[in-house]
Regions:
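Extended catalytic cores of very large enzyme megasubunits
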Residues: 1-255
Length: 255
């Protein structure tokens, strides 16, 4: 069902507001979740549609609505809110709901300067396509809203001046795994990459912040904490201060 209201899509084009399309997105977010109502999310959103409203604004209102409904009696709204956020993220990163190939994502992000180009030197296209077959984008539905929000805000590679995000959580997990095991023997590394991807994307292990945020980027940060020693001289103290500043800028802890 559509009406005369015109909304603005992410690419800047305009289309008639389609209420059924919005309802379909909310229904998908609630699928399989006990104690969650798509109608209640929509009513609680109380969206006041107007000409020129963006699809991004509509989605953000729906996410807030689901998040506001989280309670001790209805905890599963945290998953509905996360799914709505994941939908928004996919639309921003892929331009549509369905994922692009892992190989194309890597090349795009190398061109943007946010992925380390050495990944294409360490792995063949065929190996990257094999890694792509291991990726399970549906695992994004296992996030709670708080968990996915933290990943989006802190760990996904992005342009923080424009808030443009360049990857999704599952691509992030696979890139981390592929980078960490890139120098392993070729006959073994695909096995280890897959196991590490499964362990992280299924939340069986936690990754230190510097590794999660920077290991796949040109920064190539592996260390979580750095011990900085200083002699009792002005030159050494000033040099230590400069080192601390550089490490802190790259998210390393200082000891």
């Amino acid at each position: 069902m559509s009406n005369g209201t015109m909304i603005i899509k992410r690419d800047g084009s305009k289309e008639h507001l389609n209420i059924d399309k919005i309802h379909k997105v909310v229904m998908h977010a609630c699928e399989g979740l006990a104690g969650v109502s798509a109608s209640l999310i929509e009513m609680n959103a109380n969206i006041q549609f107007y000409d020129g409203m963006s699809t991004q604004e509509i989605q953000e209102v729906l996410i807030r609505s689901a998040n506001d409904l989280i309670s001790l009696d209805a905890p599963n709204y945290q998953y509905a809110a996360a799914r709505l956020l994941a939908y928004t993220l996919n639309k921003q990163v892929f331009g549509e709901f369905n994922a692009i190939s892992f190989y194309d994502m890597i090349n795009k992000n190398i061109e943007r300067g946010v992925y380390d180009s050495s990944i294409l030197e360490m792995y063949t296209k065929e190996e990257i396509e094999t890694l792509d077959s291991y990726i399970r984008h549906k695992r994004d539905e296992n996030f709670t809203y708080a968990g996915l929000r933290q990943v989006v805000d802190k760990y996904l590679v992005q342009d923080r001046s424009s808030d443009e995000i360049f990857e999704t959580p599952q691509f992030m997990y696979m890139m981390i795994a592929a980078t960490l095991f890139a120098n392993y023997p070729k006959e073994d590394r695909m096995y280890y990459v897959r196991r590490y991807y499964d362990a992280t994307s299924l939340f069986k292990i936690n990754i230190p912040t510097p590794v999660m945020a920077g290991v796949r980027t040109p920064v190539r940060q592996f260390a979580s904490c750095v011990l900085v020693d200083s002699d009792d001289t002005l030159d050494s103290i000033f040099a230590s201060d400069m080192s601390i500043g550089r490490y802190t800028a790259q998210r390393a802890g200082i000891g």
